[in-house]
UniProtKB/Swiss-Prot annotation:
Belongs to the selenoprotein S family. It is a single-pass membrane protein. It comes from Xenopus tropicalis (Western clawed frog). It is found in: Endoplasmic reticulum membrane; Cytoplasm. This is Selenoprotein S. Keywords: Cytoplasm, Endoplasmic reticulum, Membrane, Selenocysteine, Transmembrane, Transmembrane helix. The gene is vimp.
Length: 189
C-alpha cells in the first residue's frame, strides 16, 4: 500500500481546499454579519415548535368533545329554541310594562296640562306650586296676589343707578378696560 498517493487530512486535493476555504469564508462572513439575528430566529423557531403542539392538542381535545349523536344534537337545538322563546317572552313582558308606564306618564302629563290651563283661566299662576293630589290653600293665593306689589315699592336697589361692572364704577379695587383695537400681533401699522 502506498501511503503517498492517498489523500489524508493534511494532503487534501486543491479543489477540496478551495471549496473548504470558500465555505469557511462565506459562513464566517454571514455569521459575523447576521449571527445575532440567526440566533434569535433559531430561539423563536424553537419556542414556536414548543407552543404549536400544545395548541394542536387543545384543538384536538375540543374536537373530540363535540357530539355526533343526532339525538343529542336535536336535544341541544330544542334547548336553544326553548331558551330563545323564554328570553323573548321576558322581553315582551318588559316591553309591555314599559308601554304601560309610558301611557301612565302621558296621562299624568295630560292631567298637569289640564290643571295648568284651568289655573290660567282662573287668573292664577301657570306654574303649579303644589304637588299632585294636594289642593292649593285659598288663603295663600289671595294674600300672595297683594303682597308682591308692596314688596316692589319697598324694595331699594343695592347699588347706585350708575353702576356698570364693566367700566369699574362702584368703588371696586380693579377696573376693567377694553383692549386696544386692531390685530394683536403685527399686521398693517
Amino acid at each position: 500500500m502506498e501511503l503517498g498517493n492517498q489523500p489524508g487530512p493534511g494532503n487534501r486535493p486543491e479543489i477540496e481546499l478551495e471549496w473548504y476555504q470558500y465555505l469557511q469564508n462565506t459562513v464566517g462572513v454571514v455569521l459575523s454579519s447576521y449571527g445575532w439575528y440567526i440566533l434569535l430566529g433559531c430561539i423563536l423557531i424553537y419556542l414556536l415548535i414548543q407552543k404549536l403542539p400544545q395548541n394542536f392538542t387543545r384543538a384536538g381535545t375540543s374536537n373530540h368533545s363535540t357530539v355526533t349523536d343526532p339525538d343529542e344534537i336535536v336535544r341541544r337545538q330544542e334547548a336553544v329554541t326553548a331558551a330563545r322563546l323564554r328570553m323573548q317572552e321576558e322581553l315582551n313582558a318588559q316591553a309591555e310594562l314599559y308601554k304601560q308606564k309610558q301611557v301612565q306618564l302621558q296621562e299624568e302629563k295630560r292631567q298637569r296640562n289640564i290643571e295648568t290651563w284651568d289655573r290660567m283661566k282662573e287668573g292664577k299662576s301657570s306654574k303649579v306650586a303644589c304637588r299632585l293630589g294636594q289642593e292649593p290653600s285659598p288663603s295663600t293665593s289671595t294674600s300672595a296676589a297683594t303682597k308682591p306689589k308692596q314688596e316692589k315699592q319697598e324694595r331699594k336697589t343695592l347699588r347706585g343707578s350708575g353702576y356698570n361692572p364693566l367700566t369699574g364704577d362702584g368703588g371696586g379695587t380693579c377696573a376693567w378696560r377694553p383692549g386696544r383695537r386692531g390685530p394683536s400681533s403685527g399686521g398693517u401699522g
